[in-house]
Swiss-Prot record:
Family membership noted in the UniProt record: Belongs to the methylthiotransferase family. MiaB subfamily.
GO CC annotation, single: cytosol
Binding of [4Fe-4S] cluster 1, residues: 11, 48, 82
Gene for this chain: miaB
Domain (Radical SAM core): residue spans on this chain: 147-379
Pfam families, per the entry: Radical_SAM, TRAM, UPF0004
Protein name: tRNA-2-methylthio-N(6)-dimethylallyladenosine synthase
Substrates-to-products reaction catalysed: N(6)-dimethylallyladenosine(37) in tRNA + (sulfur carrier)-SH + AH2 + 2 S-adenosyl-L-methionine = 2-methylsulfanyl-N(6)-dimethylallyladenosine(37) in tRNA + (sulfur carrier)-H + 5'-deoxyadenosine + L-methionine + A + S-adenosyl-L-homocysteine + 2 H(+)
Domain TRAM per the UniProt entry, residue ranges: 382-444
Amino acid sequence: MKKLYIRTFGCQMNEYDSNKIADVLNHSHGLVLTDDAASANVLLLNTCSIREKAQEKLFHQLGRWRKLKDKNSNLIIGVGGCVASQEGELILERAPYVDIIFGPQTLHRLPSMLNEVLTPTPGMSVKPSIDISFPEIEKFDHLPKPKTSSVTAFVSIMEGCSKYCTFCIVPYTRGEEVSRPFIDVINEVKILAIQGVREVNLLGQNVNAYQGLMDDGEIADLALLINIAAQIDGIKRIRYTTSHPTQFSDSLIEAYMEVPKLASHLHLPIQSGSDKILRLMKRGHMVIEYKSKIRKLRKIRPDISISSDFIIGFPGENEQDFLDTMTLIDEIGFDKSFSFIYSARPGTLASSYLDDVDMDVKKQRLALVQKTIDKNTERISKSMVGSVQKILVENVAKKRDNLFGRTENMRNTHFKGDKSLIGQIVNIKITQGRGNSLVGNLIA
C-alpha cells in the first residue's frame, strides 16, 4: 500500500486544502495518509507565506526530507501552498530534488502531475512538474466527494482576496476573490452531515465577501448561505472565518438573531486600533466603524465572544498609535487574538515602507497586547463557572473516562461521559475555568 505524508503550515484554509489533497490522491492513486514521513512514498509540504521566515521553514523541512530521498531515490517530494505559488522557481533552484510544485488553486491537478513524475515520456529525462497558475474556482469542480469521520469539518466557500491591504500577500498567492456556486457549498455540507458532521466552519480568506451564484441566477451572500446550511438535517452548529470589517454587513448581523445554530463567536480582525495605521494598511475603515458593528452585534448576542488579529510595530506606529490599540482592546474586551510583530512580505506595498519601529519596542508592545488579552481570556473563562453551557461533544479526551468538546465561544471543555454522546450537543455545568479551558459536569 502506497503512503502519503502531508506537512501543513498556516491557516484553516491550508488544513482544508491538505484534506482535499489527501482525498484527491487516495481517489486517483490509492495513496493512504500516514503520520510517519519515513515510511511514505510521497511527501507533500503545504506552505503558508503570511508570517516571517516562511521560506526558512520550507527549506529547513525540505533539508530533512532530502536525507530520506538520498536513501530512497523513488521517493517523491512536492511543495504546495502559498510559498510555492510565490517562489516556485526559487524552490527548484535551492532544492532541485523537489519533484512537484503546485499552488493553492491547482491541487486538483496533482494526479496528473504525479503521473508526469512517475511515468515520464520515453526518451525524456524526468523533470519536475510545476503548476502554480490561477484557474479560479476550477479546483472545486475536480475534487472527489468529501470524506470524514469527525463531527466537525471545514468547508471552503470562496478563494482569494481582493482587498490588497498593504501588508498582505494573500491576493498575490491565492488570487482575487472567487466564490463557489451556492448549490455546490450546500451539497458539500449535506454530504458531510450524512457522514456525521454536526459543526461546519465556512472558510474564506475574506469569507463575508461571499457572493455565490444560485441556480436562478440570483446571488447569495454569506447570511443566506448560513441560513440555508442551518436547515440541513444533522447540522447543529455553524461557524465561519475569516471576516473583513468592511463587509461585515447588517444582513450578517441579523443572521445572529435569525439563526440560533450560528455560534456566538466572531473572529473579526482589525489589525490596529489607530486610524492612522489603518489608513497606512489600506484597511478601508475607521476604528469607530468597527466599534459600531460590534455594538450592533452585541445588542443581538450580548454574550458573543470577539477575537481579532493585531499587527504590532507596523511602519509608522508611534506610542500614541499603540496606546490607541490598547484602548480598543480594553473597550471591546477581545477574548482572543492572533498577534504578531510586523514583518514585510516581499511584493506587498508595505514592503516599500520604512520599517522604523525598533525591534525591542515591537517585542515589548506585543508582550503587552498578549498579556492583556490573556487576562481577558482568563476573566471570561472564570466568569463561566457556575453557568450551563451547550457543548458539542467532539471526541474522547486524553483521560479515557473524559469527553472533549467546545462551547460556542471556543472554550475546550472536558467532562465525564459515555462516548455514545459524541456528535451530540449536551448541557454541561461548568465547575472550573482556566485559560481557554473549562471543566464541568454533564447535566442529565
